[in-house]
Amino acid sequence: MLRKSVFAAMASAILFVVPAQAEGDAAAGAKVFNQCKACHEVEKGVNKVGPTLKGVVGRKAAAVADYKYSEAMIAKGAEGLVWDEANLTTYLANPKGFVPKTKMAFAGLKKPEDLANVIAFLKTHP
């Protein structure tokens, strides 16, 4: 009986800790975003080589009206791809693996904490 109680307490503790880690740190994400600044901005209406990332979390793919997306990204948007945290994580880890023929030349973020942190940063720019 005691073992079950201890196990249940440990399982509950893990459930509360894991989501907190998955949320990421926006301040650390701002530093990670420095790798993105050559091509992206987080200000409304400011496109560079890549589209503005202001409001990207929750946005449909290829939805910035005044940006010329690749045909591959336009097709993903037409299929209904939405940039939720899961899709952003997968894309930012391996852009060309997730959207073959994307215009994004960046190879991807390799560290899971960098992915979580940059997404936390992007969430601060709705």
Regions found by a protein language model. Give the residues of each.
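Sequence/structural segment immediately N-terminal to covalent heme-attachment motifs in c-type
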Residues: 23-48, 53
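Short Fe-S-cluster ligation motifs
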Residues: 65-82
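Bacterial N-terminal signal peptides
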Residues: 8-16
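Structured segments of extracytoplasmic/periplasmic soluble domains
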Residues: 32-42, 56-59, 91-98, 121-125
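N-terminal, post-signal-peptide region of Sec/Tat-exported proteins
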Residues: 44-69
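Sec/Tat signal peptide C-region and signal peptidase I cleavage site
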Residues: 17-22
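Positively charged n-region of N-terminal signal peptides that target proteins for export
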Residues: 1-4
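C-terminal capping alpha-helices of c-type cytochrome domains
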Residues: 82-126
